[in-house]
Each structure stands twice: as structure tokens, then as C-alpha cells.
């Protein structure tokens, strides 16, 4: 039976890097990036003058869960990563392993300020991103199997080892 691995954490915590590494190193694995299931901006709530990507309402959950189910029928390992990785109870219940990547707030702010994907972001918005993470990172208080703080790529193989030991 295919294994579902959920990887959650705040923006810039290393979720995508970890999932990409695991997809390359685990046999017959696929990486699903939650960002690929964001709704069109006009359907997402706003905060001040900005699209609020930091709310679970920004995700097309129906399409995302359908993709996960389809992938579980096609791969040995399905790696779902995103800021809302633990938001969906059905996925939480199906998951074989839940990995949380944490960053101290100061490190998050430094990394996010360097991010230029959306241009320079105002400080109030960075604070909003952090607060939204605290609210939405694990709303169901799901038991997390592995937690890493400020993970480094050299530690990725430790997670791979744990995954390969799953029954």
C-alpha cells in the first residue's frame, strides 16, 4: 500500500526542498505541492490591499484531495507539502507520517524578507503570515511524528531513513 507523507511548516521552512529530495531518493515517489492547488486570486479573501494566501480558503481542497487519491494509486510514496499540510482531517487520518518543519520567528523573517517572488512585502504582511501560520499550521492538533527546527539539507536523509522503515 502506498505511503502518504505530509510535510508542513511556515513559509521558507524547507518543505519543498525536503519533498523534492525525498521524491528523488525514495523508490517510485511523487511530490505534490499544495501551492499548485491555489484558487484564482479573485476567489481568495483579501487582507488590506493584498490577496490573503495565508488562509485555508485559498486552496482548492477538492482538487488537492483528488490528486492525492489518484497518486496513492500510482506511486509507492506520495509527499504532500504545504503550509496547510495538516488542515484536512481526511488526509491527516490517511497519512502514514507527518513531518513538521519549524523556524524561529526571527529566522522566518530574515528568509522571507529575502524572498522576491512577490516583490518587497510590507512588514505588517510578514507579521500576518507568521500569525496565520500559528493559527493554521495544525488546527486539529494532529499528532506530528517528526519535528525539525531549522532543518538543513544534510538532515534530509534522516527523514528518508524513517520513511523507509514505515510498515
What is each PLM-predicted segment?
Residues 2-5, 21, 25, 74, ...:
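NTP-dependent small-molecule kinase module
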Residues 24-35:
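Post-Walker A helix-loop "phosphate-sensing" segment adjacent to the P-loop in P-loop NTPases
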Residues 30, 39-82:
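Conserved nucleotide-sensing/catalytic segment adjacent to the nucleotide-binding pocket
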Residues 49, 97-140:
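A glycine- and Lys/Arg-enriched "phosphate-lid" helix/loop adjacent to the NTP-binding pocket
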Amino acid at each position: 500500500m502506498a505511503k502518504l507523507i505530509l510535510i508542513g511548516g511556515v513559509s521558507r521552512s524547507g518543505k519543498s526542498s525536503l519533498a523534492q529530495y525525498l521524491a528523488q531518493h525514495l523508490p517510485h515517489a511523487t511530490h505534490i505541492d499544495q501551492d499548485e492547488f491555489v484558487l484564482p486570486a479573485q476567489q481568495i479573501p483579501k487582507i488590506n490591499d493584498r490577496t490573503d494566501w495565508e488562509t485555508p480558503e485559498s486552496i482548492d481542497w477538492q482538487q488537492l484531495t483528488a490528486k492525492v487519491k489518484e497518486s496513492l494509486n500510482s506511486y509507492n510514496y506520495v509527499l504532500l507539502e504545504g503550509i496547510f499540510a495538516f488542515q484536512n482531517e481526511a488526509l491527516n487520518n490517511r497519512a502514514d507520517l507527518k513531518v513538521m518543519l519549524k523556524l524561529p520567528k526571527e529566522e522566518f523573517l530574515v528568509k522571507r524578507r529575502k524572498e522576491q517572488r512577490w516583490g518587497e512585502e510590507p512588514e505588517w504582511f510578514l507579521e500576518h503570515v507568521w500569525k496565520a501560520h500559528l493559527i493554521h499550521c495544525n488546527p486539529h492538533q494532529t499528532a506530528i511524528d517528526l519535528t525539525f527546527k531549522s532543518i538543513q539539507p544534510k538532515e534530509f536523509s534522516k527523514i528518508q531513513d524513517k520513511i523507509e522503515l514505515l510498515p
